[in-house]
């Protein structure tokens, strides 16, 4: 963790801003804008880009991915520019929490992977890029989005230490633990060999998850 040098009020304000940005449910907004219905009633019911992809609409899934990662990155960049590095890490954490527990959806949100990657890219782009490449490499081999997410999250702290960003390690560990908790059902299905693979549409995924 960086040294806490900013004032309490500044940290509170950037933390709240990060949470509010993170809590914007772009997956729901995008699917409705594309006329795809309520994302919470599609596939797994998750509000993230992977579930949007289950509609078969790749542009909508890409837009969701970019916006979910972008909101985390923007929260970090605003906090860093306005306050400092301690506020930037706080905003990364609160924007991530906002995606997981959005006030607008009764605190029932997504799993946070895109927002996690967005915050890392903004905090230290080499670490963020390394985690993105870890996700892509795992996805190319396994074709399982959740496994790719878990590998990216687990590798985050390792990349932070290897790339000279040890001051981010505590944050990276907390975010990784939360991602694993949010993926507990996916972990069970991975162990059972029943986790759906990337590219399957909603009807296929629902039958696989029943």
Swiss-Prot record:
Q: Where in the cell is it found?
A: Cell inner membrane
**Residues making up the signal peptide according to the UniProt record:** none
Catalytic activity field:
an acyl phosphate + sn-glycerol 3-phosphate = a 1-acyl-sn-glycero-3-phosphate + phosphate
* Stored Pfam families: G3P_acyltransf
Q: Which UniProt keywords apply?
A: Cell inner membrane, Cell membrane, Lipid biosynthesis, Lipid metabolism, Membrane, Phospholipid biosynthesis, Phospholipid metabolism, Transferase, Transmembrane, Transmembrane helix
Q: In which pathway does it act?
A: Lipid metabolism; phospholipid metabolism
Q: What is this protein called?
A: Glycerol-3-phosphate acyltransferase
């Amino acid at each position: 963790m960086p040294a806490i040098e900013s004032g309490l009020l500044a940290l509170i304000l950037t933390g709240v801003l990060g949470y509010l940005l993170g809590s914007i449910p772009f997956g729901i907004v995008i699917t409705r804008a594309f006329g795809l219905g309520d994302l919470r009633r599609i596939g797994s019911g998750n509000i993230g880009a992977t579930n949007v992809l289950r509609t078969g609409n790749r542009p909508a899934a890409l837009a969701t991915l970019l916006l979910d990662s972008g909101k985390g990155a923007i929260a970090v960049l605003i906090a860093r520019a306005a306050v400092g590095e301690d506020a930037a890490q706080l905003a990364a954490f609160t924007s991530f929490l906002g995606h997981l527990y959005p006030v607008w959806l009764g605190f029932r949100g997504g799993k946070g992977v895109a927002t996690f990657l967005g915050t890392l890219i903004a905090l230290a782009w080499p670490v963020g890029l390394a985690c993105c490449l870890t996700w892509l490499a795992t996805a190319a081999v396994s074709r399982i989005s959740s496994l790719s997410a878990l590998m990216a999250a687990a590798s985050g702290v390792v990349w932070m230490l290897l790339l000279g960003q040890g001051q981010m390690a505590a944050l990276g560990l907390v975010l990784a633990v939360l991602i694993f908790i949010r993926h507990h059902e996916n972990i069970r299905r991975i162990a059972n060999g029943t986790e759906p693979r990337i590219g399957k549409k909603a009807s296929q995924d629902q039958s696989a998850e029943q």
